[in-house]
Regions:
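Walker A/P-loop NTP-binding active-site region of P-loop NTPases
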Residues: 22-83
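P-loop NTPase motor domains
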Residues: 53, 57-60, 78-307, 385-390, ...
Length: 440
C-alpha cells in the first residue's frame, strides 16, 4: 500500500509465484503484519490450509471457522452491507432539504447493492451445484421473490431471510411471482419452479452439508485488527464444496469492506484500508470456472475499493491447467495487471513462460532458478536437524514490468515469530523431525 502511495506501483496489488515449501505464506504473513502496524485490516477470506489462523490470533484479530459441523454462512447475508442500512436510515432522519435528497439516493443504491449481491450469490451457488447454467428467468424469479419477502416486513436489512425462507416463498408462489413466471395454474407454477426448488434444497443439505442452512454464525467484524475465515475443515478433495464456500466467503468479505466505505463516505465512520489475500490460488482457480471471472473482477477494482490485493500460487502452470481457453487468458491477465510481481524459486521453463509478461536479466534469472533447487541429499546424525533448501525465504520483487532491475530480498524470522510458531506449516511432522534416524 505504501509503494502505491509513493507512486512506485500503479495499483496496490502483488502476484506471488514460487515452488512449494519456499516460504510464500511466510512472506505474506510478514507483509500482513506490516499492514496491521499501519492500521490496515488484513482479510483472508478463505484460508484453505489454516496457515493464517495463528497470525490472526496473535494480532488480536477475528478467526471464523467454516466447514462441515463448523458454523454456518447465510448466502443471503451480504456481509455487513445490509446491517449499515438501518444506520444510514437513522442518520437520514436528522437531515433535510438537498442534503436529505442526496442521502436518499445513497440509501437506495445501498439497498440495491444488497439485493444484487443476494441474487448473484444464490444464482452462483445454484450454478455450482448443478455444474451448469442457471436460466435468466430463474434469476428473475429469485430477484422478484426476495423483493416481495422484504416488502412483507418479515425481514429487515440487518435481519435477512435464509435459504429456507426463499424456498418457502417460491413454493407459495404469489400472484406477482406467477405472473412474472407466466404460470396460469398451480400445475404450471410447480413445473416452473421444480428444478430451482430442487437446486435450492440441495444447497440446504447436499454436498455442502449444512454450511448454508441457517443464519451466519459469526459475521465478519471489519473493526477487528485482522480477519481470517478458516475453511481448512472442508475436505481437500471436495472441489464443488470448496468453490461454493469460497464464493460465499468472498461475497461476505467484500460486502463488509463496502459497508465500511459507505459509513466513511457518509461521515459515520473512519476511512479504513484493507488487505485481501487469496492464497493457494491453484486450488481456488481449479474448483470452478466461475471463480476465475470473480477474481478478475476483484483485480480490476481493488484501487477503487481501498484494497491491497495479494494473489499467491505456485507457477503459471496452475493457470494454464484451467479447463477453458477463456479462463486461461483471464487468469494470465492477473500477472499483467498486478502492481508488482514477486517470484521465489522457479525452474527455467517457468521463467521462459513469464518472459512475455516480465523481463529478467541473466543474473536475475540465474538467481531465481538457483532458488528452485532442493537441499543437497546429505543426512544429519543430529536429532531434529533438517537441511534447508537454498531458496527458502528468498524472493525477487519486480515492481515494474519494463525491464527495470528487480529487488532480491530474504525473509528473516524474529525471535517472537519463532517462539509463537507463526510460520510453522510443518506441525504435523513435528514428532517425525525429532525422532532421529528411522530404519527402512
Amino acid at each position: 500500500m505504501s509503494w502505491f502511495r509513493e507512486g512506485i506501483i500503479a495499483n496496490p496489488s502483488a502476484f506471488i509465484l514460487s515452488l512449494p515449501g519456499l516460504g510464500k505464506s511466510t512472506l505474506i504473513r510478514k507483509m500482513l503484519m506490516g499492514h496491521v502496524a499501519q492500521g490496515h485490516v488484513p482479510i483472508i477470506a478463505g484460508d484453505i490450509k489454516g496457515e493464517y489462523v495463528g497470525f490472526t490470533e496473535q494480532v488480536g484479530g477475528q478467526v471464523i471457522t467454516l466447514g462441515h459441523g463448523h458454523g454456518t454462512l447465510n448466502p443471503l447475508d451480504a456481509g455487513a452491507l445490509g446491517s449499515v442500512v438501518p444506520i444510514l436510515e437513522k442518520h437520514r432522519a436528522t437531515l433535510s432539504g438537498h442534503e436529505a435528497q442526496e442521502f436518499d439516493a445513497l440509501l437506495e443504491r445501498t439497498k440495491e447493492q444488497v439485493h444484487g449481491r443476494q441474487v448473484t450469490m444464490v444464482t452462483a451457488l445454484v450454478g455450482l451445484g448443478r455444474k451448469g447454467v442457471v436460466a435468466d428467468w430463474e434469476s428473475m424469479l429469485i430477484s422478484v421473490a426476495l423483493r416481495e419477502m422484504y416488502d412483507t416486513g418479515r425481514f429487515t436489512w440487518d435481519n435477512p431471510p435464509i435459504l429456507q425462507d426463499l424456498i418457502d416463498h417460491l413454493e407459495a408462489g404469489g400472484d406477482t411471482l406467477r405472473a412474472k413466471g407466466r404460470a396460469r395454474s398451480d400445475e404450471q407454477w410447480n413445473q416452473r419452479i421444480d428444478e430451482l426448488a430442487l437446486s435450492l434444497n440441495a444447497l440446504m443439505d447436499g454436498a455442502v452439508g449444512r454450511i448454508f442452512a441457517g443464519k451466519t454464525t459469526t459475521p465478519i467484524n471489519v473493526n477487528a485488527t485482522a480477519v481470517c475465515v478458516d475453511v481448512s475443515a472442508i475436505d481437500s478433495g471436495d472441489d464443488a464444496v470448496k468453490a461454493a464456500v469460497m464464493i460465499s466467503c468472498w461475497s461476505a468479505a467484500f460486502g463488509s469492506i463496502e459497508a465500511s466505505h459507505l459509513l466513511a463516505d457518509a461521515g459515520l465512520g473512519r476511512q479504513r484500508y484493507f488487505a485481501a489475500t487469496l492464497d493457494e490460488m491453484w486450488q481456488i482457480l481449479s474448483a470452478a470456472p466461475g471463480l476465475v471471472s470473480r477474481i478478475d473482477t476483484l483485480t480490476r477494482t481493488n484501487r477503487t475499493t481501498g484494497l491491497a490485493l495479494y494473489q499467491i500460487t505456485h507457477t503459471s502452470k496452475d493457470m494454464e491447467a484451467l479447463p477453458t481457453e477463456e479462463d486461461r487468458k483471464t487468469a494470465m491477465g492477473f500477472i499483467e495487471r498486478a502492481g508488482m510481481v514477486i517470484t521465489g524459486g522457479l525452474p527455467v521453463e517457468e521463467l521462459d513462460k513469464l518472459t512475455g509478461k516480465l523481463s529478467f536479466s541473466p543474473a536475475e534469472a540465474e538467481m531465481i532458478t538457483s532458488w528452485s533447487k532442493g537441499a543437497p541429499p546429505k543426512r544429519s546424525r543430529t536429532r531434529g536437524a533438517k537441511a534447508t533448501p537454498p531458496g527458502r525465504g528468498r524472493f525477487m520483487i519486480k515492481p515494474s514490468k519494463d525491464g527495470s532491475p528487480g529487488i532480491p530480498v530474504q525473509t528473516v524470522l524474529f525471535p517472537t515469530e519463532i517462539e509463537y510458531e507463526l510460520h510453522d506449516t510443518n506441525k504435523r511432522f513435528e514428532g517425525f523431525f525429532t525422532e532421529g534416524e528411522v530404519s527402512v
